[in-house]
Design a protein with these regions (language model features):
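Short, charged beta-turn/beta-strand-edge "cap" motif at the junction between a beta-strand
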Residues: 95-98, 228-231
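A short, N-terminal "cap"/entry segment at the start of jelly-roll beta-barrel domains
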Residues: 1-39, 120-173, 187, 254
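Conserved short histidine dyad/triad with adjacent acidic residue
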Residues: 24-31, 43-58, 159-164, 174-192, ...
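Asparagine-centered strand-capping/turn motif at beta-strand->loop junctions
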Residues: 100-103, 232-235
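Short acidic-glycine-tyrosine-enriched beta hairpin
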Residues: 64, 78-93, 210-227
């Protein structure tokens, strides 16, 4: 049983139907209403075959998406990309994007917004071919290749950058993958000028956040509030988890 206020499981959150999508059911796991998040939002969407996100853009926020299962075709900057489980995608501010599921099984997608979206109709623009809008210049590739990095204070774990300013030009979010061996740990540090979410892919992560102990198993998310002192250690089996940071310049008011 989960007793930590910092750990949230998807089935603890009610589902909703997002705008600009078809055949999609979302659960907003990390947000203002669930954990008081002000700098980022994390949800999991379940999408049926042939459905997904219509072509739209978010003028004032960034979006990153990770395919947990299933397969589909994404489109960013007018470039199509076939995605399968384990792939990340990134949509910068103001860039039109879409996603359609191609697998027989429904796809599940982990989605990150920074700043938070919260289904604000003013934060989304549906594509209108009769009145195309200018977009930022596209990069050479929209594929995201992990970059190994060394994190001070992290022992016994391999860390890779998935999305940040250097790899994808992100201005409001950063995503890293941590592959930890048994006995790995991250020494206590204070989280400054950002909020942090851990998404546990495999194994279990234990630790403390804001003087409260937590234990998070595969499929759960841990929210670390801005200013909190936190640390982590691996469970009996070495875990794999994402570290998702949101550092939007102007956090939402509580």
């Amino acid at each position: 049983m989960n007793t930590s206020p910092h750990v949230v499981y998807p089935d603890q959150v009610a589902s909703y139907r997002p705008a600009n999508h078809t055949g999609t059911s979302n659960r907003r796991i990390i947000g203002r209403d669930t954990v008081g998040a002000r700098r980022l939002e994390v949800l999991i969407g379940t999408i049926s075959k042939g459905h997904g996100a219509q072509r739209h853009a978010h003028p004032s926020l960034e979006q990153a998406s990770y395919l947990l299962c299933g397969a589909g075709v994404s489109e960013v900057y007018g470039q199509q990309r076939h995605m399968s489980a384990g792939d990340w995608g990134f949509s910068p501010e103001g860039v039109f994007h879409s996603f359609t599921v191609t697998s027989e099984e429904p796809a599940q997608v982990l989605v990150v917004y920074a700043p938070p979206y919260q289904e604000n109709p003013r934060a989304a623009v549906l594509y209108n071919p009769a009145h195309p809008q200018p977009e930022p210049r596209p990069p050479l590739t929209t594929a995201l290749a992990p970059v190994p990095v060394c994190w001070e204070g992290t022992e016994g774990a391999r860390v890779e950058t998935i999305v940040d300013t250097a790899t994808a030009g992100a201005q409001h979010l950063a995503i890293h993958r941590v592959v930890a061996a048994a006995g790995s740990q991250g020494r206590a540090r204070q989280l400054k000028n950002r909020e942090r979410v851990l998404y546990v892919l495999e194994g279990a992560v234990e630790g403390q956040a804001d003087q409260r102990a937590f234990e998070a198993r595969a499929g759960s998310l841990v929210f670390i509030p801005e200013g909190a002192l936190w640390q982590w250690r691996s469970g009996r089996a070495g875990p794999t988890f994402f570290v998702i940071d949101g550092f939007a310049a102007e956090p939402l008011p509580i």
